[in-house]
From Swiss-Prot:
SUPFAM superfamilies in alphabetical order: S-adenosyl-L-methionine-dependent methyltransferases (SSF53335)
Origin: domain of life: Bacteria
Matches recorded under Pfam families: tRNA_U5-meth_tr (PF05958)
Family membership noted in the UniProt record: Belongs to the class I-like SAM-binding methyltransferase superfamily. RNA M5U methyltransferase family. TrmA subfamily.
Enzyme Commission number(s): 2.1.1.-, 2.1.1.35
Protein name: tRNA/tmRNA (uracil-C(5))-methyltransferase
Catalytic machinery residues: C324 (nucleophile), E358 (proton acceptor)
PROSITE patterns: SAM_MT_RNA_M5U, TRMA_1, TRMA_2
GO CC entries: cytosol
Record's catalysed reaction(s): uridine(54) in tRNA + S-adenosyl-L-methionine = 5-methyluridine(54) in tRNA + S-adenosyl-L-homocysteine + H(+); uridine(341) in tmRNA + S-adenosyl-L-methionine = 5-methyluridine(341) in tmRNA + S-adenosyl-L-homocysteine + H(+)
Keyword Methyltransferase: yes
Role summary: Dual-specificity methyltransferase that catalyzes the formation of 5-methyluridine at position 54 (m5U54) in all tRNAs, and that of position 341 (m5U341) in tmRNA (transfer-mRNA).
């Protein structure tokens, strides 16, 4: 695979290999046959980052080969959305002959949505000021004249210049209902929007008919908690990153959801609060004991759950676990399978043509 060519004819084979690999990894836990969710074979990534290489009068996007570290020129990137590909060409054309925008530009980051909004962040090794802003506004207006709903941001050391805003609002059709998700520049969002919809719908299916409340750790911008709110009496969710919490609060209002409460704290701190080991000012006015959480949802970082959180989640009758690293999932299952059994297993091909797998498990108390 090269950045400008996807081996789409090999898609089925690479997905089949992942299915076999996941089944093998899950054999010790008596997991059922995985439900498999395919990705679009191209234009599936909604965000991408590129270094900018200056070559005489020319400049272009590059990425670095992960093995050799050699640079690879990238004029098109079929893994990314069609809007990113369109913007890649227009940004180079708009910057190439503009000294103010070109000088010491070293990276461009793209964030797009299925609702056809875009943020383009331009990163510099120089101070940015009014001259940069004026030229960037001209470029933005030229892009908008081509019916592109785009926002430009300039970044340098300790500097961030927003021409308009630093967010886009994604709209996703989830099980017959449109969900609005605010996505903030430089914050985590699911890279594969089509796969995100399938993950949300699978999580809804796995929690259908649930009793009681839902607890979610690592909720981000509320991606899962808001979609799952329709299956529970109430949802209590934790997140540590301030921009993500702010986005989650916006998303709660935008989707007219009244049964989700977001708390800004780490999963480890929440464990201490639930166990009565520590009191937190952030929890004033929230009666944790009033929640009857029968289900816990976790979507941890690649490192998986720490040992304290493992113990905590074992106290819940149902555990829904989305993993971006099946190896750490299996490590966690060595503990969780002592008390719970794997009811459902799903493979989400979030990153086609790579070794990476995203998967989900529903665990129920034995």
């Amino acid at each position: 695979m090269t950045p400008e060519h996807l081996p789409t004819e090999q898609y089925d084979a690479q997905l089949a290999e992942k299915v076999v690999r996941l089944q093998s990894m899950m054999t010790p836990f008596a997991a059922p046959v995985p439900e498999v969710f395919r990705s679009p074979v191209s234009h599936y990534r909604m965000r991408a980052e590129f270094r900018i290489w200056h070559d005489g009068d020319d400049l272009y996007h590059i990425i670095f080969d992960q093995q050799t570290k050699s640079r690879i020129r990238v004029n098109s990137f079929p893994a990314a959305s069609e809007l990113i590909n369109q913007l890649m060409t227009l940004m180079i054309e708009g910057v190439r002959n503009n000294p103010q925008l070109r000088h010491k530009l070293f990276q461009i980051d793209y964030l797009t949505t299925q609702s056809n909004q875009a943020i383009v962040s331009m990163l510099y090794h120089k101070k940015l000021g009014d001259e940069w802003r004026k030229e960037a506004e001209v470029l933005r207006d030229a892009l908008r004249a081509q019916n592109i709903n785009v926002h430009l941001i300039g970044r340098a050391t300790k500097t961030k210049i927003m021409l308009d805003q630093d967010y886009v609002d994604e709209r996703l059709p989830v099980a017959g209902k449109e969900m609005i998700y605010r996505q903030v520049e430089n914050s985590f969002t699911q890279p594969n929007a089509a796969m995100n919809v399938q993950m949300l719908e699978w999580a809804l299916s796995a929690t259908e008919g649930s009793k009681g409340d839902l607890l979610e750790l690592y909720c981000g911008n509320g991606n899962f908690s808001l979609a799952l709110a329709r299956n529970f009496e109430r949802v209590l969710a934790t997140e540590i990153a301030k921009p993500s919490v702010a986005s989650a609060q916006y998303n709660i209002a935008a989707n007219h959801i009244d049964n989700v409460q977001i708390i800004r704290m780490a999963a480890e701190e929440f464990t201490q609060a639930m166990n009565g080991e520590r009191e937190f000012n952030r929890l004033q006015g929230i009666d944790l004991k009033s929640y009857q959480c029968e289900t816990i949802f976790v979507d941890p970082p690649r490192s998986g759950l720490d040992s304290e959180t493992e113990k905590m989640v074992q106290a819940y009758p149902r555990i829904l676990y989305i993993s971006c690293n099946p190896e750490t999932l299996c490590k966690n299952l060595e503990t969780l399978s002592q008390t719970h059994k794997v009811e459902r297993l799903a493979l989400f091909d979030q990153f086609p043509y790579t070794h990476h797998m995203e998967c989900g498990v529903l665990l129920t108390l034995k």
